[in-house]
Regions:
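N-terminal phosphate/diphosphate-binding loop that engages ATP/GTP or pyrophosphate donors
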Residues: 205-262
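Phosphate/Mg2+-binding loops and adjacent switch elements
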Residues: 280-346
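Walker A (P-loop) phosphate-binding motif
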Residues: 182-225, 347-356
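Short, charged/polar "capping" segments at the starts of alpha-helices
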Residues: 20, 36-43, 227-229, 301-305, ...
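Extreme N-terminal, non-catalytic leader segments
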Residues: 172-189, 196, 327-351
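Nucleotide and nucleotide-moiety/phosphate-recognizing core
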Residues: 1-138, 146-160, 169
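Short internal beta-strands
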Residues: 30-34, 108, 219-221, 249-250, ...
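Phosphate-binding/switch loop-helix module in NTP-utilizing enzymes
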Residues: 259-289
Length: 356
């Protein structure tokens, strides 16, 4: 399947999201460089006022797209951006522009030592060098760039800005983060196919790791048995037994409210009742998880891996097709993934996993 047209959690496709955000950022001209024409590309170009160009030599990868795009450029300098970077911040161009001077042909941002050639500034004449390289059989960006005058610019920014959707597992991550973009406050579901898997312990270990990053959490648990908060015979229990539909207790260190309902309220309903000093809502459930969900697996039952599942944490982790899989005790990675899904910035070592 062509990843450019994969549906994201906000209803857009990966490519249409990039085009919309580029247009909103105020770029005067947008050139959509593609390997060949197809109806979806023509329609997207028309919708966002982009100039659609195609590669002179198909199947040559990004190098051919750069050559074709720069040949059609109307300005001396252009931002070359891959269409699969859903979280790129177009304001980064302001940091690159001062370096676009003199003999420089490419302003190449680097992050944690990684080149970002598909989020770089290129001078128009660099396109000729790409075309010449392709003609002689060179299509690797690294080889071509070494023949140009390149100004490397180390950046200390959120690694998520350069995250690209190169794999089905990365697509799941992107959908989870975009789902949270559309919410007033982000949600993370922790689910497991069977009791005894360790959902509570997993969340208990995750919370302090998030707190180090300043994340204030609330946890909402699904219960299938019914519950009574107070001890039988105590005041609030007696009020409920007498027929009160709700009771509340206020104390110097907090409060709780218990309300009887005729049917289970969904998590969103409960979230709306919690005060706004919370940064992340974690929901614990066996089957009622929302996107994004971290699925836990201890081998007690087969986990249901549907579109809501963003990553799998399992005992004796093994590779899982199209899904990130980690050891059930790898809480540092769980925290990094959670921060990414929240849209929180990740720097240095914390962000490297989202660059590769």
């Amino acid at each position: 399947e062509d990843k450019r047209f994969l549906p994201m959690a906000d209803g857009e496709t990966l490519l249409s999201r990039t085009l919309r955000r580029g247009r909103t950022a105020g770029f005067r001209t947008i050139v959509l460089a593609a390997e060949g024409e197809r109806r979806e590309l023509t329609e997207l170009a028309a919708a966002y006022g982009a100039h659609l160009v195609t590669d002179d030599r198909p199947q040559q990868g990004p190098a051919a797209a750069i050559a074709a795009g720069l040949a059609a450029a109307e300005t001396e300098w252009s931002l070359v951006l891959s269409g699969d970077m859903p979280f790129y911040d177009f304001d980064l161009v302001r940091a690159l522009l001062p370096e676009a001077r003199g003999a420089v042909q490419v302003v190449l941002p680097t992050l944690a030592g990684y080149w970002q050639p598909l989020a770089a500034l290129y001078r128009r004449d660099a396109g000729q060098a790409f075309a010449a390289a392709i003609a002689r059989g060179d299509r690797k960006l690294g080889i071509i760039l070494r023949g140009l005058t390149v100004r490397e610019l180390p950046l200390a920014v959120d690694a998520g800005l350069f995250f690209n959707v190169n794999t089905p597992a990365a697509y799941r991550l992107a959908c989870g983060r975009i789902a949270n973009e559309g919410r007033e406050r982000p949600i993370l579901s922790v689910a497991a196919p069977a009791s005894g898997t360790g959902k509570t312990t997993f969340i208990e270990r995750l919370i302090p790791r998030l707190a180090v990053h300043g994340v204030r959490t609330a946890v909402i648990k699904s219960d299938s048995h019914g519950f009574q908060l107070d001890t039988e015979g105590k005041d609030t229990a007696r009020f409920m037994t007498a027929g009160a539909r709700a009771t509340a207790i206020s104390a110097p260190n907090g409060y709780f409210i218990q309300k009887i309902e005729d049917q289970r309220k969904d998590f969103q309903n409960l979230i709306s009742k919690i005060e706004y000093d919370i940064d992340l809502f974690i929901t614990e459930s066996r089957s009622r998880g929302a996107l994004p969900t971290l699925m836990l697996d201890r081998g007690l039952a087969a986990p249901e891996i549907d579109a809501r599942v963003t990553a799998l944490f399992q005992k004796d982790a093994a590779p899982h097709d199209g899904l990130l899989s980690y050891d059930l005790d790898d809480m540092e990675t769980a925290a990094r993934i959670t921060l990414f899904l929240m849209g929180r910035p990740l720097y240095g070592a914390d962000g490297i996993m989202f660059l590769t």
